[in-house]
């Protein structure tokens, strides 16, 4: 199977037709292979799940060997939002392709990601009318709370995780997102990792796995 975004795909270890899917979006300057390491760990415990880890559609302005979902360099908030909407369309298209090619419904699909991939997953999942199952977010934030508040179309379950020492996307962004989803009556789980910078710790990987098991199995 091929998708509109170049993707690292990990097929179910059961060698059966997938019963569900997890789409993981990498961070700024990364690629699908980077975040597929997380999927490789989860895969052993989720043997009927297909994992799709796409490369973002643009070469990264700050890291020519990596990719970006949208440009963050010298951009105004309005420009960032505008460019994120283009990436959102591409991620929505990928979700539809994963549904079609694997004969799944949206409620059998979880999306998520790290940093910029988390930002895009939150925006896409909340605005999508065909409700996905859940969203897993590591070290991210809401791109534009005003835009998102005016475009809520579904309420997937959410887990947000963040390091308290993150200097790239600060803990304030996590707290803002937590407050936004609480005010808008989302079912949300959160976890702050102590002495953790901008990364996914082992505990975060384990919590993500538990979240998927609970919601897809």
Please describe what each predicted stretch is.
Residues 130-142:
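A conserved short beta-strand
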Residues 113-117, 121:
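Gly/Ala-rich beta-loop-alpha elbow adjacent to hydrolase catalytic centers
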Residues 36-40, 170-180:
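Short alpha-helix in the alpha/beta-hydrolase fold that links the catalytic acid
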Residues 159-162, 166:
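Short beta-strand/loop motif that positions the catalytic acidic residue
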Residues 103-113:
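Alpha/beta-hydrolase fold nucleophile elbow
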Residues 175-217:
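C-terminal catalytic histidine-bearing segment of alpha/beta-hydrolase fold enzymes
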Residues 37, 123-127:
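Active-site signature of alpha/beta-hydrolase-fold catalytic machinery across serine-
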Residues 2-104:
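Serine-hydrolase catalytic machinery in alpha/beta-hydrolase-like enzymes
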């Amino acid at each position: 199977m091929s998708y509109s975004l170049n993707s690292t795909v990990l097929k179910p270890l059961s060698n059966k037709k997938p019963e569900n899917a997890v789409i993981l979006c990498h961070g700024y300057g990364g690629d699908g292979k980077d975040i597929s390491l997380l999927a490789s760990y989860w895969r052993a415990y989720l043997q009927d799940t297909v994992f799709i880890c796409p490369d973002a559609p643009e070469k990264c302005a700050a890291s020519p060997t990596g990719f970006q979902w949208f440009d963050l360099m010298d951009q105004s908030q309005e420009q960032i939002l505008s460019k994120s909407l283009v990436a959102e369309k591409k991620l929505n298209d990928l979700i539809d392709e994963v549904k079609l090619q694997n004969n799944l419904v949206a409620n059998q699909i979880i999306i998520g990601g790290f940093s910029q991939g988390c930002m895009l997953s939150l925006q896409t999942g909340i605005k999508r009318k065909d409700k996905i199952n859940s969203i897993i977010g590591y070290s991210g934030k809401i791109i534009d709370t005003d835009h998102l508040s005016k475009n809520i179309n579904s309420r997937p379950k959410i887990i947000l995780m963040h390091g308290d020492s993150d200097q790239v996307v600060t803990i304030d962004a996590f707290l803002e997102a937590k407050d936004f989803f609480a005010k808008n009556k989302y079912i949300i789980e959160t976890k702050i990792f102590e002495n953790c910078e901008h990364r996914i710790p082992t505990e975060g990987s384990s919590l993500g796995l538990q979240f998927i098991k609970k919601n897809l199995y």
